[in-house]
Amino acid sequence: MELKGKKINFLGDSITEGVGATDPEAMYVNIVKHDAELAEARNYGISGTRIARQSNDEGSAYCDRYKKMDEDADVVVVFGGTNDFGHGDAPLGTMADRTPDTFYGALHTLYSGLTEKYPRSAIAVVTPLHRVGEDNPRGDGSKPEDGALLKTYVEIKREV
Protein backbone atom coordinates (compact mmCIF):
# COMPACT_ATOMS: atom_id res chain seq x y z
CA MET A 1 0.00 0.00 0.00
CA GLU A 2 1.34 3.42 -0.94
CA LEU A 3 1.38 5.60 2.19
CA LYS A 4 2.60 8.89 0.72
CA GLY A 5 0.07 11.62 1.48
CA LYS A 6 -2.04 9.36 3.74
CA LYS A 7 -3.35 10.03 7.24
CA ILE A 8 -2.57 7.42 9.89
CA ASN A 9 -3.96 7.09 13.41
CA PHE A 10 -1.51 5.33 15.75
CA LEU A 11 -3.20 3.78 18.82
CA GLY A 12 -0.86 2.50 21.47
CA ASP A 13 0.98 2.73 24.77
CA SER A 14 4.30 4.32 25.83
CA ILE A 15 6.10 3.00 22.76
CA THR A 16 3.65 4.82 20.50
CA GLU A 17 3.57 7.88 22.74
CA GLY A 18 7.35 8.09 22.43
CA VAL A 19 8.36 7.69 26.06
CA GLY A 20 12.13 7.45 26.29
CA ALA A 21 12.79 9.01 22.90
CA THR A 22 15.61 11.52 23.22
CA ASP A 23 14.18 13.65 20.42
CA PRO A 24 10.60 13.88 19.06
CA GLU A 25 11.92 12.92 15.64
CA ALA A 26 13.15 9.62 17.14
CA MET A 27 9.60 8.53 18.04
CA TYR A 28 8.48 5.69 15.79
CA VAL A 29 5.33 7.56 14.76
CA ASN A 30 7.41 10.50 13.51
CA ILE A 31 9.91 8.20 11.79
CA VAL A 32 7.05 6.56 9.87
CA LYS A 33 5.58 9.99 9.05
CA HIS A 34 8.89 11.21 7.65
CA ASP A 35 9.96 8.04 5.84
CA ALA A 36 6.53 7.34 4.30
CA GLU A 37 5.86 11.03 3.55
CA LEU A 38 2.52 10.94 5.36
CA ALA A 39 0.15 13.90 5.30
CA GLU A 40 -0.58 13.30 8.99
CA ALA A 41 0.56 10.93 11.72
CA ARG A 42 -1.80 11.20 14.67
CA ASN A 43 -0.40 9.88 17.91
CA TYR A 44 -2.96 8.29 20.23
CA GLY A 45 -0.36 6.64 22.43
CA ILE A 46 -0.76 6.83 26.22
CA SER A 47 1.89 5.35 28.48
CA GLY A 48 0.87 2.38 30.63
CA THR A 49 -2.43 1.73 28.88
CA ARG A 50 -3.80 -1.66 27.94
CA ILE A 51 -6.11 -3.14 25.33
CA ALA A 52 -8.53 -4.61 27.90
CA ARG A 53 -10.36 -2.69 30.59
CA GLN A 54 -8.84 -2.96 34.05
CA SER A 55 -10.41 -2.88 37.50
CA ASN A 56 -9.31 0.76 37.90
CA ASP A 57 -9.56 1.77 34.25
CA GLU A 58 -11.17 5.23 33.88
CA GLY A 59 -11.63 4.87 30.10
CA SER A 60 -7.98 4.49 29.07
CA ALA A 61 -8.29 1.02 27.51
CA TYR A 62 -7.74 0.84 23.75
CA CYS A 63 -11.16 -0.78 23.37
CA ASP A 64 -12.65 2.53 24.60
CA ARG A 65 -10.13 5.11 23.33
CA TYR A 66 -10.43 4.30 19.63
CA LYS A 67 -13.87 5.95 19.69
CA LYS A 68 -12.26 9.37 20.20
CA MET A 69 -9.81 9.13 17.29
CA ASP A 70 -10.19 11.24 14.15
CA GLU A 71 -12.48 9.54 11.66
CA ASP A 72 -10.75 10.39 8.38
CA ALA A 73 -7.72 8.10 8.74
CA ASP A 74 -6.61 6.10 5.73
CA VAL A 75 -4.80 3.65 8.02
CA VAL A 76 -5.13 2.75 11.70
CA VAL A 77 -2.17 1.14 13.48
CA VAL A 78 -2.82 -0.70 16.77
CA PHE A 79 0.35 -1.46 18.73
CA GLY A 80 -0.17 -2.95 22.18
CA GLY A 81 -0.53 -5.89 24.51
CA THR A 82 2.74 -5.62 26.43
CA ASN A 83 1.06 -3.81 29.34
CA ASP A 84 -1.83 -6.30 29.40
CA PHE A 85 0.86 -8.94 29.91
CA GLY A 86 3.10 -6.95 32.23
CA HIS A 87 0.70 -5.49 34.75
CA GLY A 88 -2.86 -5.85 33.52
CA ASP A 89 -5.48 -7.38 35.78
CA ALA A 90 -8.01 -8.39 33.12
CA PRO A 91 -8.25 -12.16 32.58
CA LEU A 92 -7.42 -13.64 29.19
CA GLY A 93 -10.93 -15.00 28.72
CA THR A 94 -11.86 -17.15 25.73
CA MET A 95 -12.29 -16.73 21.99
CA ALA A 96 -16.06 -16.57 22.55
CA ASP A 97 -15.82 -13.47 24.79
CA ARG A 98 -17.25 -10.21 23.54
CA THR A 99 -16.79 -8.18 26.73
CA PRO A 100 -14.05 -5.54 27.00
CA ASP A 101 -13.19 -6.89 30.45
CA THR A 102 -11.13 -9.82 29.11
CA PHE A 103 -8.18 -9.68 26.72
CA TYR A 104 -9.97 -11.78 24.08
CA GLY A 105 -13.17 -9.79 24.45
CA ALA A 106 -11.40 -6.44 24.35
CA LEU A 107 -9.68 -7.42 21.11
CA HIS A 108 -13.03 -8.41 19.59
CA THR A 109 -14.55 -5.12 20.81
CA LEU A 110 -11.64 -3.09 19.46
CA TYR A 111 -11.36 -4.83 16.09
CA SER A 112 -15.09 -4.83 15.37
CA GLY A 113 -15.32 -1.19 16.47
CA LEU A 114 -12.43 -0.18 14.23
CA THR A 115 -13.81 -1.98 11.18
CA GLU A 116 -17.18 -0.30 11.75
CA LYS A 117 -15.69 3.18 12.31
CA TYR A 118 -13.15 2.85 9.47
CA PRO A 119 -14.85 0.65 6.84
CA ARG A 120 -12.61 1.86 4.00
CA SER A 121 -9.37 2.12 5.96
CA ALA A 122 -6.56 -0.37 6.35
CA ILE A 123 -6.09 -1.61 9.91
CA ALA A 124 -2.65 -2.83 10.95
CA VAL A 125 -2.10 -4.75 14.18
CA VAL A 126 1.39 -4.86 15.69
CA THR A 127 2.14 -7.56 18.25
CA PRO A 128 4.15 -6.80 21.40
CA LEU A 129 7.93 -6.61 21.14
CA HIS A 130 10.19 -8.99 23.02
CA ARG A 131 10.82 -7.63 26.50
CA VAL A 132 12.50 -8.29 29.82
CA GLY A 133 10.52 -10.88 31.79
CA GLU A 134 8.53 -12.15 28.82
CA ASP A 135 8.90 -15.71 30.15
CA ASN A 136 7.67 -14.80 33.64
CA PRO A 137 4.01 -15.79 34.10
CA ARG A 138 3.75 -13.01 36.71
CA GLY A 139 4.56 -10.34 34.10
CA ASP A 140 6.23 -7.44 35.89
CA GLY A 141 5.68 -9.28 39.18
CA SER A 142 2.18 -8.15 40.09
CA LYS A 143 0.20 -10.96 38.47
CA PRO A 144 -0.77 -14.37 39.88
CA GLU A 145 1.65 -17.28 39.55
CA ASP A 146 -0.53 -18.90 36.88
CA GLY A 147 -0.48 -15.89 34.54
CA ALA A 148 0.17 -16.24 30.83
CA LEU A 149 3.48 -15.58 29.10
CA LEU A 150 3.93 -12.70 26.64
CA LYS A 151 3.88 -15.16 23.73
CA THR A 152 0.34 -16.15 24.74
CA TYR A 153 -0.80 -12.54 24.32
CA VAL A 154 0.91 -12.42 20.92
CA GLU A 155 -0.82 -15.66 19.87
CA ILE A 156 -4.21 -14.34 20.99
CA LYS A 157 -3.77 -11.11 19.01
CA ARG A 158 -3.02 -13.21 15.93
CA GLU A 159 -5.94 -15.57 16.59
CA VAL A 160 -8.54 -12.84 16.98
Show which residues each predicted segment covers.
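Short, conserved loop/helix-junction motifs that constitute active-site signature segments
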Residues: 2-3, 70-71, 116-118
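Short hydrophobic segments within beta-strands
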Residues: 11-12, 126
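Conserved SGNH/GDSL esterase-like catalytic core that processes O-acyl groups on lipids
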Residues: 7-9, 15-105, 151
